[in-house]
């Protein structure tokens, strides 16, 4: 049986726009006629949605499912952490609460949940043509990589091509993108197929040199997406055809990897 292809959106940090871009990609691919499903291995959020069967998943994954034209299911977000305090979270596995765990205890036992993640991903890959995967935080948190189930480990499991997103609005987008690439292993770096400069304001022509520099240094295509006042973080909780990304500009280096 042919398994679904996978595209993964990873970011240089939390809040760079992964959820909205993943939602937009689900919408675009659905409108192109593909059977699409979203996936996020592990989400940390108080904002939960309830599936038709009563399971809890991250609200973003529910919005992504609606954008893809399918009903949300627990396999789309097999692990949900709902913070209760700075060092304690309620653990929801496949839609069901399993208890509260201290941060150290969760990270220490995190690998025991990897089979749950694999099985959920495999379920979706058997049924759909394309899986659009959202990462969590950054793939380059060196002190957490041994237990990171949400980024490059998932990309390898799904054999996914990765889009790396940086947020120009918060500043330092060159360091964000190039620094993250530098901290990845060679095999991880090879999965990254494009860079996205997100939340750009103003005249895109003023960033043409920036796009060229990023493309030449990373040897990857670079895309620039505008900041939109119409899209708020809460926008991913609704289904909207307006979530089709509008590219302000892009560049490809003649030497970038294909």
Residue ranges of each PLM-predicted region?
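Flexible phosphate-sensing "switch/lid" loops adjacent to ATP/NTP-binding sites
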Residues: 1-258
């Amino acid at each position: 049986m042919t398994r679904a292809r996978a595209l993964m959106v990873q970011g240089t940090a939390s809040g760079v726009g992964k959820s909205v871009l993943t939602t937009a990609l689900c919408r675009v691919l659905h409108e192109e006629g593909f059977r699409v499903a979203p996936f996020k291995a592990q989400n940390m959020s108080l904002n939960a949605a309830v599936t038709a069967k009563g399971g809890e998943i991250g609200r973003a994954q529910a919005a992504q499912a609606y954008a893809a034209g399918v009903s949300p299911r627990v396999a789309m977000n097999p692990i949900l952490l709902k913070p209760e305090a700075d060092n304690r979270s309620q653990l929801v596995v496949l839609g069901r609460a399993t208890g509260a765990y201290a941060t150290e205890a969760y990270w220490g036992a995190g690998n025991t949940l990897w089979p749950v993640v694999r099985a959920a991903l495999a379920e979706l890959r058997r049924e759909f043509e394309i899986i659009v995967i959202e990462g969590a935080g950054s793939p380059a948190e060196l002190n957490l990589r041994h237990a990171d189930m949400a980024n490059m480990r998932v990309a390898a499991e799904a054999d996914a091509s990765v889009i790396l997103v940086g947020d120009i609005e918060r500043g330092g987008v060159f360091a964000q993108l190039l620094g993250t690439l530098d901290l990845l292993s060679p095999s991880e770096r090879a999965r990254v197929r494009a860079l996205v400069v997100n939340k750009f304001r103003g005249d895109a022509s003023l960033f043409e040199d920036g796009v060229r520099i990023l493309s030449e240094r990373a040897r990857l295509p670079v895309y620039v997406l505008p900041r939109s006042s119409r899209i708020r973080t809460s926008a991913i909780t609704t289904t909207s055809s307006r979530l089709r990304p509008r590219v302000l500009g892009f560049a490809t280096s003649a030497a970038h990897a294909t």
